[in-house]
């Protein structure tokens, strides 16, 4: 089966299964190798209520080589870059098989939202947040879903503060602001160090933060 026929067959299979709430469409009718896929966030996760858009580029060697997929929708997740939408998932790399379809790949991405792999991250900062404070991580991921993936979102953060966007404790920022440091610099350093909150007795981390703020 030619690549074009396979792609058309896969699109029809998605249309024939509306209960899956997955879509697969061409970006342009003149280019059958560039598509957009969508799926819903898994229930019971911080991504519930979101609709996630994935950009799909199908290579000439498909289905013997995997499609290139990345999220158009911003997602707060250990295995998805919070900046570019790049994805760390084995079936899109070395574990790809010709029997995998675009639909099943999207279902695998949906499953990835439900079951992150923080020890094999695409976004190290987010992975550290997930491992250190799951409750705070869930709150931040849910905020991103509301801001970027909900039906009422416009893809912009609006008036949401940068600290909230990355799950950083306000009291921690206030503490360093009281020492005369600028808020933007504090948030930048805390993000770079992967610090979301701080134990009052953790003097080593506090000193490291101050050293970075003074640079």
Curated annotation (Swiss-Prot):
Signal peptide: none annotated. Its EC number is 2.3.2.23. The active site is at 88 (glycyl thioester intermediate). PROSITE patterns: UBC_1, UBC_2. GO terms for molecular function: ATP binding; proteasome binding; ubiquitin conjugating enzyme activity; ubiquitin-protein transferase activity. Residues 2-150 form the UBC core domain. Transmembrane segments: none annotated. Pathway: Protein modification; protein ubiquitination. Keywords: ATP-binding, Isopeptide bond, Nucleotide-binding, Stress response, Transferase, Ubl conjugation, Ubl conjugation pathway. There is a cross-link at residue 93 (Glycyl lysine isopeptide (Lys-Gly) (interchain with G-Cter in ubiquitin)). It holds the Pfam family UQ_con. It is an enzyme of class 2 (transferase). Induction: By heat shock and cadmium. It catalyses: S-ubiquitinyl-[E1 ubiquitin-activating enzyme]-L-cysteine + [E2 ubiquitin-conjugating enzyme]-L-cysteine = [E1 ubiquitin-activating enzyme]-L-cysteine + S-ubiquitinyl-[E2 ubiquitin-conjugating enzyme]-L-cysteine. One of its GO terms (biological process) is vesicle organization. GO terms for cellular component: cytosol; nucleus. Catalyzes the covalent attachment of ubiquitin to other proteins. Functions in degradation of misfolded or regulated proteins localized in the endoplasmic reticulum (ER) lumen or membrane via the ubiquitin-proteasome system. Cognate E2 conjugating enzyme for the HRD1 ubiquitin ligase complex, which is part of the ERAD-L and ERAD-M pathways responsible for the rapid degradation of soluble lumenal and membrane proteins with misfolded lumenal domains (ERAD-L), or ER-membrane proteins with misfolded transmembrane domains (ERAD-M). Present with 8940 molecules/cell in log phase SD medium. Belongs to the ubiquitin-conjugating enzyme family. This is Ubiquitin-conjugating enzyme E2 1.
């Amino acid at each position: 089966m030619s690549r074009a026929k396979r792609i058309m067959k896969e699109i029809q299979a998605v249309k024939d299964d509306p209960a899956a709430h997955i879509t697969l469409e061409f970006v342009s009718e003149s280019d059958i190798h560039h598509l957009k896929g969508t799926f819903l966030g898994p229930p019971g996760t911080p991504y519930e209520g979101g609709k996630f858009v994935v950009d799909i580029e199908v290579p000439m060697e498909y289905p013997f080589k995997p499609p290139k997929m990345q999220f158009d929708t911003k997602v707060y997740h250990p295995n998805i870059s919070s900046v570019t939408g790049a994805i760390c998932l084995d079936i899109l790399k070395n574990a790809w098989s010709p029997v995998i379809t675009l639909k099943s790949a999207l279902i695998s991405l949906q499953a990835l939202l439900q079951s992150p792999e923080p020890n094999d991250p695409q976004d190290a900062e987010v992975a550290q947040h997930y491992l250190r404070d799951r409750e705070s991580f869930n709150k931040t991921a849910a905020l991103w879903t509301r801001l970027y993936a909900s039906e009422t979102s416009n893809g912009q953060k609006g008036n949401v503060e940068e600290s909230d966007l990355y799950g950083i404790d306000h009291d921690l920022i206030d503490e360093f602001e009281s020492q005369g440091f600028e808020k933007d610099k504090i948030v930048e350093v805390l993000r770079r160090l992967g610090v979301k909150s701080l134990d009052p007795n953790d003097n080593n981390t506090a000193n490291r933060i101050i050293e970075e703020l003074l640079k």
